[in-house]
Amino acid sequence: MREVLLSECIDLLYESHFVISKPFGRSCFDLIAKKADLRFLIKILKNIDSLSTEQSEELLNIAKMLQAVPIIIGTRTRNSVMEEGAVYERYGIKAITFNTFRDQLSGEPPVVYANRGGFFVNIDGAVLRETREKLKISVGELAEISRVSRKTIYKYEQNEANPSAEVAIKIEEYLDVPLIKGINIVDYMEGLKSQKSREEAFEKILKEGEDFKIRVIDILGDMGFNLLETTKAPFDAVAEESKIEDSENQNIIFTNIQETENEEIRRKAMIVDEISKMLNSHSLLVLEKKTNENKRITSMSISELEKIGDTVDLLEFIEKRKKSKEI
């Protein structure tokens, strides 16, 4: 079922003129999709409650650094089948069905969101109040018709609470005015977590006994990069040049860190290189010792990395390697 859903999402994104990465296995996301300035990090799950805390944290952190929208596409929750046209949320990440995603890409955003107690909608509180006062309808009258308290009506008008879909429809019909607002899932998510500090990254890697990764991340941090260490992605770290604030000129390096090189490492590095090209960024494979030069992969030994002065020098090094491979 998951593979079918993944295939359907790939077809939909191609039809919608997105550029798409190759699918990843055992990652916090399955696809990266890009169209103009819009970027999606997509996780496909049959059961959206199977997303782990660790996966969600990493997905959110990568999304923040890449200025992308993280989204889960699934078919059910732990207890029931997901409703079409409804937005669910897991660990701060929006979760929807394939059909809801398709409608959103077609310009038809969902209007209902799932929360404790049922399904709710966002309404325009200012329009509600203006219309009620214009029609000379009291708060008490509207509360009686809607079967909620006067206090609740006041909260709706102040946008301090949202009604259930059933209550919202009653109010709209009584006032004869549209109040329900769509939920734009492609809006950049507020409150995305910041990337981990170097100390947090070290603590996690230390537990896994990966001293070589610590050395590499330490060197990159000393150069001046913002760093995000990952364990649930096809790359081991994302390094962002601290000085760059203009997102159009964002210098990001997707970094794979391995002591030894083998066919699996090269395959993984080539996938990451494709991601970097898609996102107009860079990729780098750092090894204990370099073996054979691969024309498709920009790689360097840790001793070479230690000789690099700062972020500018490393980016220049990568650019030169890229150009030499194109010749």
UniProtKB/Swiss-Prot annotation:
PROSITE patterns linked to this entry: HTH_CROC1
Keyword Phosphoprotein among record annotations: no
GO molecular function, one term: DNA-binding transcription factor activity
HTH cro/C1-type domain sequence ranges: 128-183
DNA-binding region: 139-158
InterPro entries: Arc_TR_HTH, Cro/C1-type_HTH, Lambda_DNA-bd_dom_sf
Record key words, sorted: DNA-binding, Transcription, Transcription regulation
Annotated NCBIfam families: PRK04140.1
Name of this chain's protein: Putative HTH-type transcriptional regulatory protein MmarC6_0210
Organism encoding this protein: Methanococcus maripaludis (strain C6 / ATCC BAA-1332)
Lineage of source species: Archaea, Methanobacteriati, Methanobacteriota, Methanomada group, Methanococci
